[in-house]
């Protein structure tokens, strides 16, 4: 008998399937907990305002409304989802506990209401304190009971209700505790408990939720249906409430706060109402594939659906979704399923009213007799829009109502007005296509978002506005959207390196004069800087602390809400807010949300004006404003200017203009008395003989809210002989005789910053200044304005006219002060000598750094009394040492010049003597470097009194090196360029010795280094090698041609110099000492002795600028003394041989027989004809 292949349509509610019956029971029993939870979420989102209203609202909504039988439904909801029943005893105990909490809370509210009506009544204050304490104790006990082992998951929905009540109670104590008569210490204790319990309750809810969800993970679609229902319903009953716990922080949110939930939940009538699910292969993962990955929030704008016929059944076959982001820009998605544009049914297109409800008509089609396979699909669906009862349909409406799964937030009104969620997106899962003999299903999956997530990111002027970071409209490169941890109400933005997170389009409903402060809720594995921009203009920049360890979990306690103290205002009603981060790499930074907090500053205008007037008047010596006070620095004037600029135009425009003119006058007076060239750092190294000179790694940066003008940043250095430096010379023509001058400025932060003032002596300070945030809360965050100008209107900004740090009578400055100053005394002035004053800022350590500005060098006072006598003594001592130095220099210069001249053939210095070798050049160079005071010992780039004669001789030394290198036909014979030009076999190294020489190290007998050299046949060459042998065996340097004509230089550890043998010689006999000395005397003479001390130079010679009264220690510069070539360490031997090639090519080979062979240099020099 043939099988009946006629398809049979089986209504979804007529199957004898116990699992479907359970699902129906879950919907009926789970509706009340969903209704109550959604109402609570609506209340927390909209009614969370200061006052006792929250407490009374919670009682009216939940604790005074829910009966014991209804509390039982909360327990039953999760019991059915996880198929775990709570024992009757524990169920009754939990319900009794909940009822007891409601009674205790009601008594507390009665006392709170009576106190509110008569807050000065002592008895009522005591009553509310007692009843608060009783309810607090009851909640602590109850919440512990709701964590009963093995029953944490079914008790979770009542746990979160009790936790929410406890946080609300503690918030009352923080807000009203002092009014109840609690001391401030007790109030602070309650506040600390509140913050700690927010994190503890959050973590318990998340851990329990994740455990329950993971327990439901399975393999088939039936298991996915239960998994998704648990995820959806506990998001509504637990996670959404937990996401609002941080708003109970009464000190962070003292006014009404607007929050948004951006997470998505899913429904699919095809899967969740299917009577056949377990037999679909890998159905769980296929259904989960319909859940969208993390993304920036979007809003469905249009939906087109096409039908598909599967085994004679017409079902939803595919669709096309178009959305818009929060900036209104369109987003087009790939086609879902099979899409036929010609047969598309228009569901929504450019309609601002979203769908709040679907009425689905799923179909489950089973084959004929003997055919167990099914076709599952959606035969039709109706979509109902908000604000109206109008329905748009795909083919027809059905009876599966999404409101049964996601109820309205208020059942008392029309659902199109009191809906809780809107349809945000539609995805599609499909299995497996047209394959005979298998199940086939087409399942649209509806994604829903909470109605609190508005499309336009509205910022209200009178409340705190929280905007989730995923509501950005533009994600910058390097930023990603990641799945939220569950307690943030949505997903997060993440970066692992410096850059911009995203751009957020915001809409301002209040006046543009309203000012705001920005806060960021973030988690980070590193200290970092956040910066913000509005419409491309910088607004804020500030340092923020690490909140978690790298690799740690995203827990509630790892998130921190912190912000910028300086307020700002928007210039346009519709603006783009940009958030970025810097100063870190290879770490993790997560952004949850941005908060805009109104800055109520109008009441401060009067006190601001009074403060600014006082500060301006304190700048001048008299009311006539003819002169500045001596202790008024340029930095002080800039800060007073900030005070004036921050005055309200609406309140005191005329006074502001008047004060601004006075401050400008003060600034001009300050500039006039400042003897520095370019004090505002317009450039460095712009003019050879004027202004600032500095190392190339110094940067000039525009003013921020620490500096109003430009400032410089000096980084650290890896070599103290090459420090980071900045200097300037004050010309003699600007100085007055017998006068004290002062260098002063402001240091934002520094480490190992050295400051010098040099004339007869060296005044020296090493200044370590911690960052501005560690001393007082100077703002370091904000730059704002239509032209990018900094906004320095921080409310904590203070200017103290008495704040100074000046050195008096030779006393040094106090270290670690942001304000610094150094004094220096000038004696007799001489324009011809032009001694002047050198100002030097230097850093010579790797960890050193400095940011400084507002530098001034100004006349302080004439010298009198002891100060006058001291500078005269210093001047005389300096002149005596100057004369002594001149005599010494004459001797050293003569010797050095003779040594240099002896290198060359004539006074044109264009040819070397035939017997000039590298040792002789080194010796001459060392003598040149004995000339003292060629450069200042404090900074070797500044020329000293002997700079001219030193540079004259040093130039000739460089010429000698160049001529010598040109004469050596072996390339890179000193290994300064590593192994360039050398052929290597085996393992060898080039090492830099502590005398700054590079040497070739041959550590193995099988290694060989060679070079092919082009020569002139018939001409004579000298092969000269300086080397050192360690251990047994011999080191050999061989020169040969293709066939024969081989010579060798051999080195061993037990002979100073080796005998030279013809190529056929196989023995190595030692030189005697006399033979070795004589063999090299013609070309090495003077090498060793050239480094001996010259008896004509005093051994205790000291730099001439040293003055004990002013300088600690001598001003010697070890880097200066180390200049020039240093001798080789003991043990190195120089040997040479004469070689006459017969062809135009020779090979030079370096090797050894055992031990280690170290070669300093290899030279092949053409003999003079």
Swiss-Prot record:
Q: Which residues form the signal peptide?
A: none
Disulfide bond sites: none
Carries keyword Membrane?
no
Database matches in CDD domains: delta_endotoxin_C
Organism's domain of life?
Bacteria
Which GO BP annotation is one of this protein's? sporulation resulting in formation of a cellular spore
What the entry lists under Pfam families is as follows: Cry1Ac_D5, Cry1Ac_dom-VII, Endotoxin_C, Endotoxin_M, Endotoxin_N
InterPro entries found in the cross-reference section:
Cry1Ac-like_dom-VII (IPR048645), Cry_V (IPR041587), Galactose-bd-like_sf (IPR008979), Pest_crys (IPR038979), Pest_crys_dom-III (IPR005638), Pest_crys_dom_I (IPR005639), Pest_crys_N_sf (IPR036716), Pest_cryst_cen_dom_sf (IPR036399)
**Could you tell me the keywords of this UniProt record?**
Sporulation, Toxin, Virulence
Indicate yes or no for the key word Heme.
no
Q: MF terms per GO, please? A: signaling receptor binding; toxin activity
PANTHER family named among the record's database cross-references:
ENDOTOXIN_N DOMAIN-CONTAINING PROTEIN-RELATED, PESTICIDAL CRYSTAL PROTEIN N-TERMINAL DOMAIN-CONTAINING PROTEIN
| Miscellaneous information on this protein | Toxic segment of the protein is located in the N-terminus.
Q: Which family does it belong to?
A: Belongs to the delta endotoxin family.
Annotated protein name in UniProt = Pesticidal crystal protein Cry1Fb
Could you tell me which species this protein originates from? Bacillus thuringiensis subsp. morrisoni
